[in-house]
């Protein structure tokens, strides 16, 4: 093996060792899934809401199919407001990737005081949505409704 190849191989190995020690970045989406579990006391996973109605999950359009879907519409609007805050205006990330601090105690969610302005705003958006989800009726027919009824969300 040529010495240049050994140098490249050594560089790759060192890079991989360094990368393995980098802890994963906590994300607002991870926090939101935990708040959902907290508010509904583990009765439903965040995955149950990922493709529900016209507004739960990525994007959103049309008219909400029910109260639960309306919770998602309000959450989308809240994040839209967060994106307009100077404190939440990040070049490549925005509020969806900003972690925040919170406490969960027997279904009660508290956004902690150590959050910066953007994290506090996002935490309150997610907290409000999680509580709304827990209080709304889940209709299995509205899960993946955009696939079942193609034109429902236009």
Swiss-Prot record:
One of its GO terms (biological process) is lipid catabolic process. It comes from the Eukaryota. Binds 1 Ca(2+) ion. Its EC number is 3.1.1.4. InterPro entries: PLipase_A2 (IPR001211), PLipase_A2_Asp_AS (IPR033112), PLipase_A2_dom (IPR016090), PLipase_A2_dom_sf (IPR036444), PLipase_A2_His_AS (IPR033113). Residues 20-27 form a propeptide. Pfam families: Phospholip_A2_1 (PF00068). Residues 1-19 form the signal peptide. GO terms for molecular function: calcium ion binding; calcium-dependent phospholipase A2 activity; phospholipid binding; signaling receptor binding; toxin activity. Its main location: secreted. PROSITE patterns: PA2_ASP (PS00119), PA2_HIS (PS00118). It is an enzyme of class 3 (hydrolase). Its cofactor is Ca(2+). Keywords: Blood coagulation cascade activating toxin, Calcium, Disulfide bond, Hemostasis impairing toxin, Hydrolase, Lipid degradation, Lipid metabolism, Metal-binding, Secreted, Signal, Toxin. GO terms for cellular component: extracellular region. It is found in: Secreted. Disulfide bonds join 38-104, 54-153, 56-72, 71-132, 78-125, 88-118, 111-123. Expressed by the venom gland. Coiled coil: none annotated. It catalyses: a 1,2-diacyl-sn-glycero-3-phosphocholine + H2O = a 1-acyl-sn-glycero-3-phosphocholine + a fatty acid + H(+). Ca(2+) binds at residues 55, 57, 59, 76. Snake venom phospholipase A2 (PLA2) that shows moderate enzymatic activity and exhibits procoagulant activity. PLA2 catalyzes the calcium-dependent hydrolysis of the 2-acyl groups in 3-sn-phosphoglycerides. Belongs to the phospholipase A2 family. Group I subfamily. D49 sub-subfamily. Monomer. This is Acidic phospholipase A2 1. It comes from Pseudonaja textilis (Eastern brown snake).
